[in-house]
Amino acid sequence: MALKLNSADLYTTLSTRDLDASTTRAAYNALDSAITLRVFDSLSEVVRQQNTPHAAISYRFVRAMQGPAMSMVRRGIAVNTKVRQDETERFLAIRAKAQALLDTLANAVWGPEHYTVVTKTVEWFTPIGKRSQPLTPQTRTVRVESDAQRPRGLNPNSDKQVLAFFNIALHFPVEYEIRKTPQGSVRTPSANGKALRKWGQARTKGPGVDARDRTIPAVRLAAPFVSLILTIRDADKMLSVLRTPLDPDGRMRCSYNVVGTENGRWSSSKSAFGRGTNLQNITPSMRRMFCADDGQWLISPDLEQAESRLVAGLVWQTTGDDTYWAACASGDLHTTVARMTWPELGWTDDQAANRKIANTPSRELPKFTYRDISKRLGHGSNYRGTPFGIAQAVGVPPNIVEDFQVRYFKAFPALPQWHAWCKRQLLDHQYLDTPLGRRRWFFGRPNEDATLREAIAFGPQSTVGELLNLIMYKVWSRSLLPQSDPAFLPLQLLLQNHDAFAFQVPLTTHLPTIINAVNGEFNSTPITFVRGGERRDLIIPGEFVTGFNWAYADTNPDPGKWTFSDGNKDGLIKWGGSDERIRTSPAVARSADFLGRPSAPSWR
């Protein structure tokens, strides 16, 4: 049967004809396909008429990304059910311990909860008539109210309780956040992580104490409560991932949206069947249950110091200053930055000695080394972060960030010049182009700091994501070649994690050969920067880790600082030319693994 349908009278035509369900669905599917083709033809003409190639480049690139994305969606990743159960028990124990301690401390602050207990009893009685004669016995309900009290505790997931505890019981000032509602943006009291951390850092003498009394020191009164609440909330997030439904074959799958963000990075969500979760948002400590299939190695490459190198390229392209480029090319960017930021520390010409100096604790902030400060604060300063904002994100006093930025921008004066160039570009054109040809229009107010910081971060972050996806695409394409082809790679893509991807190869594969071949794709994919008549190619080397599960193995000599009690011997380690380990925990758990499993680990 052939039907000629117009979209305007589709419903009337299909509802008045005597069509079976299969034919009706076929008609709808055909119309959807026809409309999609018409939209494609129209958009293709719009793209063709553009004066710049940016739209066409981006469109072709994201269409190509559907291949590796669908490959990973269909394959999924194996889940070690034994590790999954062990981790569930571990986080349940952590949560129970933290909740018990939080309830005890909260009860000491705001005391027990007073409530009314209502007791109802049914009793028989004999009513008396008008002439004092007994009538037929009847029943009645006697209601007795009595006052009682019980431990109040504190529910960390109840904003109402948390706000009452901090703002009323502890007398901390109310923190607000802007929430979007159908009626518009509304300023409401907040008990989110940012508000909790602010309360935790505040020093006070406590409720009922005269603030002018110098005999009582101010302390961080809320710190224990904040720590416990955040611990419980983190445990709840971990448990939600651990309890995520698996597919019938025991694997976890997600769906990837290759055009899910404004800067070209992918986004991830549940699979098309409602199972799985966002696999791009799994914390490092949660990754252990995700593993390679039995008989396979798990390999994960990423771009080494990619964002810093791209900032260096953009700074040179816009200002002509290559000081930061030279620092990135030195081999140890953060030590070089520390040396240029604190020249008074007695540096030498020996790279190993300088690394040792950079790893000494800072005088102003002993819990961080000079190298740590250079890494953490330098990253935020590259994107024009304010001292207050960086201090809040890193957890250091704002004056430390202010002092660092004075030194940092003195060592690299071209960075503020690049920020100024981005501001002019934003004000004049309201768009920016990346070195890979993606153009983004910014619809926020071009004179606002938030829009400017977003524009500054766009270039490096978008380029890192698309460069890694391009390399992943080239690697995936080689896995589709015939095995007789010299360029064939015997690998299977498993995951894409914004700035890294993961694949598996058989244990029989010669690891150095595979890693050298993949690294060759990194080295053959340069990013070109042009300034006037000069061109510079930036090659960002790949950094590889190998193992059997997705979490990192604990390498700290002190077992007390391990993430996992057993050190996660099957975890990822940095590739150093060889990996002779033998797998200890299979992907498909044996029955003996469950029968001999120890009891739930205690909270620590």
Across the structure, where does each feature detected by a protein language model lie?
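Secondary-structure transition/capping motifs at alpha-helix termini
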Residues: V46-Q49, R75-A78, A93, V109-P112, ...
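Conserved "right-hand" nucleotidyltransferase catalytic core of DNA-directed polymerases
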Residues: A2-I282, C291, G295-W297, E304-E307, ...
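Hydrophobic (often cysteine-bearing) scaffold residues that line and stabilize catalytic clefts
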Residues: D32, E307, S330, H334, ...
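Function-dense linear segments that define catalytic or interfacial modules
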Residues: S255-P361
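Extended, non-catalytic structural segments that build the interaction scaffolds
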Residues: Q50-A55, P151, V315, T319-A327, ...
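Short, contiguous acidic/charged loop-to-helix segments that flank catalytic cores in large enzymes
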Residues: P151, V241-D247, G274, M286, ...
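C-terminal polymerase-core module
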Residues: A93, P112-P217, K410-Q461, T508-R604
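Conserved catalytic core of nucleic-acid polymerases
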Residues: G67-R74, R131, Q138-T139, D249, ...
